[in-house]
């Protein structure tokens, strides 16, 4: 069975974009692959989160993953910092990484531009740590978005370079994995782009009905169509895209027909969209609250996930040490 690895930084609650863009695919993948899903708390240290927030954010993501249906009996769910072997492999890969290639990565240049007063070594070597996360389990597939494709190419480069330096065929070159039709891009509520964690742009799986309704009713629209069958402007198309995802085909066609004959009332569209989002998220939200209240269950998932992840990582690291010459 092929091994798949995917990580998420614990920087905020999961939203509809996370669910339809990734998690829904994970629910299928956990039955077909040897899956390792981890919460990347080490990666979050580049932005220096408050110590009190680290554990809380990890527990939040863990509870939300479980509430969505990721099964710890079928997939290994673990916290990155519980697998110390990753740091040792990170060290070895850094010894074979070159300053110039790390400085040229788009992700580093973009983050350095956004936070010029915090251009730390963790940002620079982000691709190396990401490669260690993947290669520690000798994964062959990694579900990532286009924004991570360059880092995936770096991971393949580091795997290939290790094999070349030590004249072995040990690390596979991991492939970027597209989940296919199950992955959907969910637009944000601010009129453009995909849904993200910025304030006002996202609907979180843990949001209650009142919060969801308030966010949807504030979504950007225009004055309405004046010409039948006209092209929808991006903010309006975004609302229809969300409607297509969470509503029935009948509901979508109803509002599409109203738009095309210039009789649509955006208030009615937003009310329907909010109601359908609430209907979808309410069972997940209730499950999140239930899981968060069960500290013993969360502790057990973390402990057992760490044990399974470390067992896999230790096997890889033992061979890596032998190949390098630590015997």
UniProtKB/Swiss-Prot annotation:
Keyword terms: Aminoacyl-tRNA synthetase, ATP-binding, Cytoplasm, Ligase, Nucleotide-binding, Protein biosynthesis
Short motif 'KMSKS' region, span: 194-198
PROSITE patterns assigned: AA_TRNA_LIGASE_I (PS00178)
This protein's GO CC annotations: cytosol
Positions that bind ATP: 9-11, 17-18, 145-147, 186, 194-198
Keyword match Ligase: yes
Motif range ('HIGH' region): 10-18
Function: Catalyzes the attachment of tryptophan to tRNA(Trp).
Stated name of the protein: Tryptophan--tRNA ligase
Classification of source organism: Bacteria, Pseudomonadati, Bacteroidota, Bacteroidia, Bacteroidales
Gene: trpS
